[in-house]
Amino acid sequence: MADNEFDIDAFFSTEKKSTSSENQHCGFIAIVGRPNVGKSTLLNKILGQKISITSRKPQTTRHRIMGVDTDGDYQAIYVDTPGLHIEEKRAINRLMNRAANSSLSDVNLVFFLVDGTHWTNDDEMVLNKLQKANFPVVLCVNKVDNVQDRNEVMQHMMEMSKKMNFVDVVPISAKQGKNIDVLRKHVRDHLPKAVHHFPEEYVTDRSQRFMASEIVREKLMRFTGDELPYSVTVEIERFDYNPETDGFHINALILVERSGQKKMVIGKGGEKIKTIGREARLDMEELFGRKVYLETWVKVKSGWADDERALRSLGYIDDL
């Protein structure tokens, strides 16, 4: 096994009842929408554990991530996508849009997430793509818990329901888990009879190395300013399990584009990078169930977000 990683199912597993392949149903559900509308939060809530990072800032999700939910004969494979957005000024933005678009191929159902309070040009762009595709779509009106006036929500839902022939229009709160059961029912109704793609204990297709890099990036987004998240990425240079310490030894390289950003990440007296490292380590220990020894470095790599060769080496093109 590469990089001395444990088998992924040792860490991303749940106890499920085994089932005969004769009665199995399996299919793919794409979760799409504009940036920062709650797609990753919804996926985490459906799975009952965190596999996709979240923050208040748009475009937190950069990679296509699969979440696997197996319940008896039914296996639903959810595809969390980067938010589709109109502006494609940089190579990384173009790749994120391509990753999101490629997720719309050969799916059995689409969850289209929108905000319960307003409709944007990015929402319209996603809608146009869905109208051209031949997939059943459930419109998920998220963040309804933020709206006090019930009539306002109903009016907003009525207006949006006219935009396309949706399978259903469901008000949800991804954060609180409201109406997740309704979405699950739609999933079951659309899963074809097919052999399961993943063993029943799997919850994600992503490796521990990938999850470690995403956790560090999440902490960077939470503890730094508004400009930095779009100019930073994380590369895991070492991911080893040491039986003597019964823990993971992880080296994370944080790449920024300018020296000023490096100073921002490190912080006065190194306090910010210490906080980022500590919070990331605690999350990794909870996720992996082992002690984690995390070391972080910050390096300036000018123009990485516009360099397709660099983006390929960092795993962004693997999603396409």
Curated annotation (Swiss-Prot):
Tell me, in one coarse class, where this protein mainly resides.
cytoplasm
Q: Where is this region: G1?
A: 33-40
Positions of GTP binding: 33-40, 80-84, 142-145
Q: Where in the cell is it found?
A: Cytoplasm; Cell inner membrane
Q: Which residues form a coiled coil?
A: none
Q: Which GO terms describe its biological process?
A: ribosomal small subunit assembly
> For the KH type-2 domain, which residue ranges apply?
216-302
Q: Which domain of life is it from?
A: Bacteria
What GO molecular function annotation could you give as one example from this UniProt entry?
Answer: small ribosomal subunit rRNA binding
- Map out region (G4) in residue numbers: 142-145
Which Gene3D superfamilies does the UniProt record give?
Answer: 3.30.300.20, P-loop containing nucleotide triphosphate hydrolases
Q: Domain Era-type G, which positions? A: 25-193
> Lipoprotein: present as a keyword of the record?
no
The UniProt keyword set, sorted, is: Cell inner membrane, Cell membrane, Cytoplasm, GTP-binding, Membrane, Nucleotide-binding, Ribosome biogenesis, RNA-binding, rRNA-binding
Per the record, which residues fall in region G5?
Answer: 172-174
Q: How does it assemble?
A: Monomer.
> So what does this one do?
An essential GTPase that binds both GDP and GTP, with rapid nucleotide exchange. Plays a role in 16S rRNA processing and 30S ribosomal subunit biogenesis and possibly also in cell cycle regulation and energy metabolism.
Give the NCBIfam families listed for this entry. era, PRK00089.1, small_GTP
Q: What is this protein called?
A: GTPase Era
